[in-house]
Amino acid sequence: MKIGFLTDVDGYRAPIHPESIEKYSLDIHLEKNIFDYLNYADSSLDNVKTISKLSDLDIVACVENIQDKTIKELKEGAVLIGIFDFDKIEEIKSLRPDLKVLSFFKLPRISRAQNLDALSSQANLLGYASVLRAAKETSDVVPMMTTAAGNIHPMFIWRKIYLII
């Protein structure tokens, strides 16, 4: 069984981490330069092949932004795994009814499946990233500083985020 992993269209996320690949002895195929955003060379992974044809893969994992052209190239009856909202699932099914589409959004939000909960993990990352982005955009000081000369009060992050959005 051949498992393929595709980069996100924006190139900043991948559906698998390099450390996870080395744990399992599976027939894994990666899209070329999938880990560029991590500054991790594909050649440093042992026993991993580059995807030559999408139609050879039995299972394909992506993050969320998969193009129609890519969907059309998939093998008949292949399994497509990703973070798809319900509209995207219907769009994929109308384009290719033979595909089995699995979305992390359809997983139950219970404590046993917490490590698979895409909503919580993505929202958590988004909150963290928005604070960093606000800090980058402002001229204020982020942390509170107490020095011999006095105190520097921290910025109000929520005001800055509101202004950016």
Regions found by a protein language model. Name each.
Residues 1-96:
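An N-terminal-biased, well-structured beta-alpha scaffold segment characteristic
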Residues 2, 68-154:
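Glycine/serine-rich phosphate-binding loop and adjoining beta1-alpha1 elements at the start
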Residues 155-165:
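Rossmann-like dinucleotide/phosphate-binding beta-alpha-beta segment
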